[in-house]
């Protein structure tokens, strides 16, 4: 598998873990550590998929997803929401904000890889 992934995550242990494992599988990984930087990186890098933490500094994940889906240059990029707050209704809230899929933390890496593959395939 290959493709470009934008990982918007503010916790170093999570972005370090995910970026290393994704790179080993042939993905190019672009990092952003807050929502505002995530929007800027999405516009600059035009990734195939965005992994978006919902609990971010500066601009939270919900607002980031809405901003990405409102902009013509990023609206078609699939977004997979990542959240530790796997509460009832969070999946619906993420989808309503513009996310295309949802993955609760802790990360189930094989499942996340399947979701990434599906998202990239849907974008073709």
PLM-predicted stretches and their roles:
Residues 16-24:
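Charged docking surfaces used in two-component/phosphorelay signaling
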Residues 45-51, 56:
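Active-site beta3 strand of CheY-like receiver
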Residues 107-116:
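C-terminal output helix
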Residues 9, 33:
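Conserved acidic carboxylate
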């Amino acid at each position: 598998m290959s493709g470009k992934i934008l990982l918007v995550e503010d916790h170093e242990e999570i972005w370090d873990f995910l970026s290393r494992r994704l790179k080993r599988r042939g993905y190019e990984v672009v990092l952003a550590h807050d929502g505002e930087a995530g929007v800027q990186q999405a516009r600059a890098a035009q990734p195939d998929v965005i992994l978006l933490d919902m609990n971010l500094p500066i601009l939270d994940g919900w607002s980031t997803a809405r901003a990405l889906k409102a902009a013509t240059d990023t609206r078609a990029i699939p977004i997979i929401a990542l959240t530790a707050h796997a509460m009832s209704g969070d999946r619906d809230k993420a989808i309503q904000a513009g996310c295309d899929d949802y993955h609760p933390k802790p990360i189930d890496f094989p499942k996340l890889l399947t979701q990434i593959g599906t998202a990239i395939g849907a974008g073709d």
